[in-house]
Design a protein with these regions (language model features):
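A charge-rich, low-complexity, intrinsically flexible signal that marks solvent-exposed coils, linkers
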Residues: 1-111
Length: 111
């Protein structure tokens, strides 16, 4: 499978599935869904209700991010996810997904 096909496979993943995984991860680490919603809400500029509606909508990650404006401070999000520096990810959509992953990882670790 070539690199673009791998990206397209990720982009087609339902946001609701990712959100469910995020909830399980932060709760396993002693944090709450509300804390997760606060972090995601800051990043993607949505309320908890809007995040929940998006999770239930069946939207893919591509569809989910196409409707959003990120925080104006998104460029300050730096670090590694799965050994990859998020600020160096070339594909804009994948960079946004990796930034979201990084924020959830940091919440789970208590940062």
């Amino acid at each position: 499978m070539n690199e673009q096909a791998k990206l397209e496979r990720v982009f087609a993943y339902p946001f609701g599935d990712i959100y469910g995984n995020y909830v399980a991860k932060v709760e396993r680490k002693g944090h709450t869904r509300d804390e997760l919603d606060d972090v995601l809400g800051w990043f993607i500029q949505l309320s908890s209700e809007e995040i929940h509606a998006a999770a239930e909508s069946g939207k893919t990650l591509r569809e989910f991010f196409s409707d959003l404006s990120l925080t104006p401070h998104a460029e300050l999000i730096t670090g590694k996810v799965c050994g990859v520096r998020v600020e160096e990810v070339e594909d804009e959509l994948m960079r946004r997904i990796r930034m979201m992953d990084l924020l959830v990882d940091e919440l789970a670790r208590g940062k």
